Amino acid sequence: MLKNKAMWIVCLALVFMLAGVMSLSAQPNPRDLGRAPNALRGLNIVVGNYWADYDTTKNPPTAQWNGSESQERTLEWRRRIQRDNGFTMQEKNIASWNEMPQIAATSIMAGRPAATVFVVQADWAMSLQKQGLLYPISDSRAIDFTTKNKVVEINQMINQLFTFQRKTYAFQIGYGGSLHGQVIFFNKRLFREAGLDPDLPYDLQKNGRWNWDEFLRICKALTRDTNNDGIMDTYAMTADLSTEILDIFVAGNNSEYVSKDARTGKLVNSTGTPAFIEALQFAIRLQREGVMMPKPDGAAWDWYKPMFNDGRVAMRMEQEYVRQDIANMRDDWGMVLPPKGPKARDYVVFTDENVLVIPSKGFTPQQVDAILWAVQAWNVPVDPRWQTALYPVFRDQRAVNETMAMIRDPKNQKFKNHILVPGLNRGSIAWEMWWFDGEPAQLVESVSSSWNTRIEDANEL
């Protein structure tokens, strides 16, 4: 499953990671960047990732090229900054998703980093930091890592996560660029055939009424026996992936699996909180209400994908990157955030981000200044209309103007802290919730000891 996820990220990440779509400014102006560090001249910078290449010396520079005006202007800008400042820079696929953590760690330990800058998952970066393998980027004054940066938007959620004893070890530009936010995709045709407005989720979301009560009402309307033979022909959703389904309601109730103690910074098991138990109860209730298509006997693990893609179920709950999987669906579709539960006042973007890190070995402080300056310059937005690059990705503008606008808003962000705990699998709850013979609180209690042990171990690393 994780390999398939990585494949879709390959197709999408170049558009949003290091592409400047989360824009703040108008036309890029070299003067906004300030004077380039002297150490930049003659430097060759490789931004190592696990999905695809971007090389400005090639035409097209990447396999994900569509020739849009935005892409053309980005390419022109990136060629210009290299030419004017005497350096070279490229994004390079240096490893597979499975290989990247080891290649990053071993190459840095050996003093021969496989890349100048690594783009890695947050949990990988945390492991690298705890091994002393990351450069404290906050020691550099080449770019402003605060909200005062007027050239690019620095992700403050990531800054806070990777700041230890007043030093910061990882950063990201913009919000939502890793496409990991939990969302609900919905089939407009099935809404219409059930007598519902095909834009109903958008309308409810916009009006602040996209909540569990409305969601359940809609699910019941979407689950239909269309030919009166006693067998349901369409369902609101599938019973898989149960982990993604539970994520939706945990997020929607402003809860989480693992939280951070505001005073100590330690990770804390949050599955026993009232908000989490309430989310688990609601997920189980949906299954018992009969609005979820059960897994067919003998079906593959990913059976749920064609059920939505082929119009058998009306909604699919997953991370945002799945929009590539449904790009060629015959039916039109939309995308909204998780509906609000009783404990939530606002919509929540439950997400994590890939992060950018610089190795602790192999570069002088002057070179780090130059590298950071170049990364910022590479990511200067070429189009002040952040929507421009997104409209072609979706079937309607409301997904961009409304849902994506909320995904980009820092105040809606909630980081998936559970990914920072090695060996912790939320499936130990989600995989069991349809079949557990007992109360939701008892299911949580049955795994609490192992969860607490793993969280304690993570805090001691």
What does each model-identified segment do?
Residues S138-E153, Q205-N207, Y235, S255-E278, ...:
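Short, solvent-exposed loop/beta-turn-alpha elements that line the ligand-binding surface or hinge
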Residues L216-A221, F249-G252, E256-D297:
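Glycine-centered hinge/linker elements that transmit conformational signals in sensory
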Residues G208, D225-T234:
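Acidic, glycine-anchored loop motifs typical of Ca2+
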Residues I94-I103, G208-E214, K295-N309:
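Short helix-initiation/N-cap motifs at beta->coil->alpha
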Residues P28-L43, N49-Y50, A95-N98, A122-G181, ...:
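Hinge/lid segment of periplasmic solute-binding proteins
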Residues L2-L14, G20-Q131, Q366, V382-A389, ...:
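Conserved N-terminal structural module of periplasmic/extracytoplasmic solute-binding proteins
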Residues R166, A327-V393:
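Extracytoplasmic/periplasmic substrate-recognition and gating elements
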Residues Q129-G132, S138, N155-Y202, A239-T264, ...:
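Periplasmic solute-binding protein
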